[in-house]
Amino acid sequence: FLAPHAPQNQGMFNPIKITLPDNCWLNAKWPAPTIGCTTLTSAKITSAVWQALAQACPDKVTGSTNADCNWFVSSVVAPDGTTDVFSDLPAGGWGGTPFGDGMNVTEDPLGNCMNMPAESAELLFPIAYESFELRPDSGGPGRYRGGLGAVFKVRYLSDGLLSMESARTLQGSPGVNGGEFSDVQRQTKIYGDGTSEVIGGLDEAGGWKSPLLSNVPFTHGETFMFESTGGGGWGKPLDRDVEAVLDDVLDEYITFNTAYDVYGVVIDKEAKTIDLEATKVRRSELSAA
């Protein structure tokens, strides 16, 4: 990576020292739980290594992926009365790169998994997908934006219990080289009467609940909503091409407010065009802030 034309051998790793004190997060001892060791933990290690390398070679490193498998399993009662298990790994975005935006809604590179098609899940289990769509403003801002996460809504057509491992609920995916963090993830239970409750992550009042869910009950007609995060941005948002910002707004990847507040691009909402002079002024204001 740092010397791409040099032959790889053991000597290249001699300068690297890894320190893992006993009973730390990366060197857990019995009886500490380690179910997420190959998923949540390994993805965070990769993210941390990217952040470290970015200090030495920011032109080669990408923003962090969502760095989560977001694995959930749920029991469901089939029409014949038997119990089945529905499982999926809702994906998030990958980080912005030195040459382009990150990919939208793609499984973490360590997972070697694919998104389950909603149609396949509905054929196999008593559930209905109410939503599987891109989540606006979820990618980290940057010269090259982080890929977007998604909004997953799964309605139960029977009773069930849901367990899930997730993270990125207090801080999103970090960017590099001036790129910014993505939005955070959130798990929500929507009741049959339309009211909702955040069961993992931050609620509107700023309260937080652990995203490690265990046997959360759902009854027929209730919906589980998961909002996955995007990837971290690469480069400063004010360096992003203004036409790319406009395209993002028109594609509903970002909102008008984000275009103005973060990217400093002034867009006429009616004409869907850029006010270049006002944009120059706005970007100067944000640069001086």
Regions found by a protein language model. Give the residues of each.
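Glycine/proline-enriched, intrinsically flexible loops and inter-domain linkers
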Residues: 1-289
